[in-house]
């Protein structure tokens, strides 16, 4: 009866309970549910920011992939470096620090060992430092030269044959030499002969013969000198070796042919006059010969103060006659003048092998006569380095060929020019 007459009253508590239960359940929310809410909010915020970026989705994905790859690569490199350092430290400990030796230590060690070895050698041989210095050095091998000698009694001529050389030392950077031979008689040095230069060889074959006009009655007082040189276009020619043959020791009843070892050359007693460098250029089509006086060096001192006032004269000659004359400016108070002055001569092609260019270096004097320091000539009937220079010019038309020449005594050059008229 009671339940039937008050149905609302019975239902009310149930409703109240139903509404209270959820209310009470939200208050003690679990930690897991709070984290999920925070993550969802962060995710929602990230997505909102992502949508604001003005890039297509595929571009964003590509950027993300590249970033991940960079991070992974950096981590890999760091790990590898750490492992490598540990490995090296371990090896260093095992080897006792051998890797710490640098090149300086190695060189110092080598030097110490070398010094010690020398001391040990001295101890074994029983030689002191003083005794070792006094020990004669082994004679340097300079090669050898084959030559022949004969005398023509009918014409009063000494015939000298330069056949070949062998086992010459290498004086050039390439391990070879450019040898040639000078031949002359002492005490008269005025007449000298030279063979052709043989390029890049230590065993040249010359097969050249030279003739000296000497009466047999005077031959006994002469000494024949044969000297082997290494040719160098831009500096002084180096002498390899020489030997002397006194004529009073030779039996001219038959032809002499023999090998002789080259000896170290004696220092030349002749006074040094200096060297001059000039270039030659010939243009056959225009018939134009150009001589450029470049410079001179180590000239002889002519003035009281130990210097000179040098200038250069150039003569074009043919058959002993002076065809043209030119001269440079004067350089004051110097033994190493620089000129770089050019002079041209008209020489037809058919005459180029008949002319001579005579170059004379003089010391200028305001009051007295200008004294010649030295002289040289190239061209017709020249010999040695001068002939080679002239030949190189003719072999290379239109191209300037520069070369150094050793100045000679004026009287000697004039005598040669007079003979070769």
Curated annotation (Swiss-Prot):
Region Phospholipid binding, residue ranges: 135-381
Membrane topology: Single-pass membrane protein
GO annotations of cellular component type: axon; chromaffin granule membrane; cytoplasm; dense core granule; excitatory synapse; exocytic vesicle; glutamatergic synapse; Golgi apparatus
Lipidation feature positions (S-palmitoyl cysteine): 74-75, 77, 79, 82
Location within or outside the cell: Cytoplasmic vesicle, Secretory vesicle membrane; Cytoplasmic vesicle, Secretory vesicle, Synaptic vesicle membrane; Cytoplasmic vesicle, Secretory vesicle, Chromaffin granule membrane; Cytoplasm
Record text on cofactor binding: Binds 3 Ca(2+) ions per subunit. The ions are bound to the C2 domains.
InterPro entries xref list: C2_dom, C2_domain_sf, Synaptotagmin
TM spans (from-to): 58-79
Modified residues (Phosphothreonine): 128
Cofactor(s) required for function per UniProt: Ca(2+)
Entry keyword set: Calcium, Cytoplasm, Cytoplasmic vesicle, Differentiation, Glycoprotein, Lipoprotein, Membrane, Metal-binding, Palmitate, Phosphoprotein, Repeat, Synapse, Transmembrane, Transmembrane helix
An example Gene Ontology molecular-function term: calcium ion binding
Expression across tissues: Expressed in the brain (at protein level). Predominantly expressed in rostral, phylogenetically younger brain regions, and in some endocrine tissues.
UniProt topological domain (Vesicular) ranges: 1-57
Positions contributing to Ca(2+) 2 binding: 171-172, 230, 232, 238
Effect on the protein upon substituting residue 367 to T: Slows synaptic vesicle fusion kinetics and exocytosis. Impairs the kinetics of synaptic vesicle endocytosis
PROSITE patterns given in the database record: C2
Chain positions with Phosphoserine modification: 264, 342, 344
Binding locations of Ca(2+) 5: 303, 363, 365, 371
PTM characteristics: Glycosylated.
Positions annotated to bind Ca(2+) 1: 172, 178, 230-232
Subunit-structure text: Homotetramer. Heterodimer; heterodimerizes with SYT2 in presence of calcium. Interacts with SCAMP5. Interacts with STON2. Forms a complex with SV2B, syntaxin 1 and SNAP25. Interacts with SV2A, SV2B and SV2C. Interacts with RIMS1. Interacts with PRRT2. Interacts with DNAJC5 in a phosphorylation-dependent manner. Interacts (via N-terminus) with RAB3A. Interacts with SYT12. Interacts with calmodulin. Interacts with DNM1 (via C-terminal proline-rich domain (PRD)); this interaction facilitates vesicle fission during clathrin-mediated endocytosis (CME).
Family label: Belongs to the synaptotagmin family.
Domain notes: The first C2 domain mediates Ca(2+)-dependent phospholipid binding.
Purpose of the protein: Calcium sensor that participates in triggering neurotransmitter release at the synapse. May have a regulatory role in the membrane interactions during trafficking of synaptic vesicles at the active zone of the synapse. It binds acidic phospholipids with a specificity that requires the presence of both an acidic head group and a diacyl backbone. A Ca(2+)-dependent interaction between synaptotagmin and putative receptors for activated protein kinase C has also been reported. It can bind to at least three additional proteins in a Ca(2+)-independent manner; these are neurexins, syntaxin and AP2.
Official protein name in the record: Synaptotagmin-1
Organism encoding this protein: Rattus norvegicus (Rat)
Name of the gene: Syt1
């Amino acid at each position: 009866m009671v339940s039937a007459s008050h149905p609302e009253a019975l239902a009310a508590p149930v409703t109240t309970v139903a509404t209270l239960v959820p209310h009470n359940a939200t208050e003690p929310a679990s930690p897991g549910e709070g984290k999920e809410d925070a993550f969802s909010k962060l995710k929602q915020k990230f997505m909102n920011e992502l949508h604001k970026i003005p890039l297509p989705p595929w571009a964003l994905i590509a950027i993300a992939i590249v970033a991940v790859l960079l991070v992974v690569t950096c981590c890999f490199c760091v790990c590898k470096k750490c492992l490598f350092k540990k490995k090296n430290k371990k090896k260093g400990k095992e080897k006792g620090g051998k890797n710490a030796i640098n090149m300086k230590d190695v060189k110092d060690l080598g030097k110490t060992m070398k010094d010690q070895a020398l001391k040990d050698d001295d101890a074994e041989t029983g030689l002191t430092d003083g005794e070792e210095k006094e020990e004669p050095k082994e004679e340097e091998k300079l090669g050898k030269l084959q030559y022949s000698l004969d005398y023509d009694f009918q014409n009063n001529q000494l015939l000298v044959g330069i056949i070949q050389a062998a086992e010459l030392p290498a004086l050039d950077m390439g391990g070879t030499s450019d040898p040639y031979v000078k031949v002359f008689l002492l005490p008269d040095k005025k007449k000298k002969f030279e063979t052709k230069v043989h390029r890049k060889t230590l065993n040249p074959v010359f097969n050249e013969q030279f003739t000296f006009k000497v009466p047999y009655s005077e031959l006994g007082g002469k000494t024949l000198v044969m000297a082997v040189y290494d040719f160098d276009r831009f500096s002084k020619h180096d002498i390899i070796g020489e030997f002397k043959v006194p004529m009073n020791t030779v039996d001219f009843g038959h032809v002499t042919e023999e090998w002789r070892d080259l000896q170290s050359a004696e220092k030349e007693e002749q006074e040094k006059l200096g060297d001059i460098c000039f270039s030659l250029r010939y243009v056959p089509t225009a018939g134009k010969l150009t001589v450029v006086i470049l410079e001179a060096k180590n000239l002889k001192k002519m003035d009281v103060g130990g210097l000179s006032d040098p200038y250069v004269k150039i003569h074009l000659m043919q058959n002993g006659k002076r065809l043209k004359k030119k001269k440079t400016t004067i350089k004051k108070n110097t033994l190493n003048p620089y000129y770089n002055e050019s002079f041209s001569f008209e020489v037809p092609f058919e005459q180029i092998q008949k002319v001579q260019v005579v170059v004379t270096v003089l010391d200028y004097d305001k009051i007295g006569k200008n004294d010649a320091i030295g002289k040289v000539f190239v061209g017709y009937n020249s010999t040695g380095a001068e002939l080679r220079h002239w030949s190189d010019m003719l072999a290379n038309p239109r191209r300037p060929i520069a070369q150094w020449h050793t100045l000679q005594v004026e009287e000697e050059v004039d005598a040669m020019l007079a003979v070769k008229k």
